[in-house]
Amino acid sequence: MTLQDKEGTRNTREATLYQRQRAPGIDQDMRLIRFSSPAEMDGSAVLTLENSDRPDDQWLYLPAYHTSRKIPSSNRSDRYMGTDFFYEDVSDDKVDQFEFTLAGSEQQDGRHCLVIEQVPIDETLKKESFYGKKRLWIDPERLLTLRIDFSDKSGVLVKRFTASSPQLIQGRWRLNHVEMLDMRISHRTTIDYRDRKIDQGLNPQLFSVRNLERGQ
């Protein structure tokens, strides 16, 4: 992971991401990301548990405090560990909270994509989210989101997500390079995934608050 400001100054981080479905056949994930470098971030971690019927649960653990802190849904627009992603960016959107419109089709990175506009209709989400609209470029053949434009509630384009370097792993396409650009401050965060391992039989207890606070 690399953070870069408008002067070109870079800050590099290393982290390990663990992910598992909450239950077989249920499309809700448990995710744990634990940082290992730089030294001041070693052991810092974020745990996300997706929920179908309520906002996702997220906890932040900072070793210096020896305890975790639950992130309230009202803070979903805070920066995720100081990156250009917000906490709401790393949680899956719940389909029934949005209205979707097919806006057309365009090329993105040489791929034919459907362009989808996504607007929140849930009243609580409207208040808590920083965004008023998202515009998504989706590759229908590979089922990949290659770009997302984020607009604020005034309709101003504020952030852009792009993804590339697709790889077919066990019959499913995955993207190994992603970038989030904050256009307001010309700051970007890029993530390069490597050493992916699939179907490792991760213990569900790995995704517990107790384990989060153990720093394991």
Task: Briefly describe each language-model feature range.
Residues 1-64:
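N-terminal mature ectodomain segment of secretory-pathway/periplasmic proteins
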Residues 9-12, 107-116:
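Conserved long hydrophobic alpha-helices within structured protein cores
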Residues 215-216:
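Short, solvent-exposed mixed-charge patches
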Residues 211-212:
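Short, low-complexity polar/charged micro-motifs in intrinsically disordered terminal tails
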Residues 16-22, 99-107, 164-166:
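Short amphipathic beta-strand and strand-loop transition segments with alternating hydrophobic
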Residues 36, 47, 57-61, 67-71, ...:
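Gly/Pro-enriched, hydrophobic low-complexity segments
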Residues 8, 42-43, 104, 155, ...:
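Glycine-centered flexibility motif
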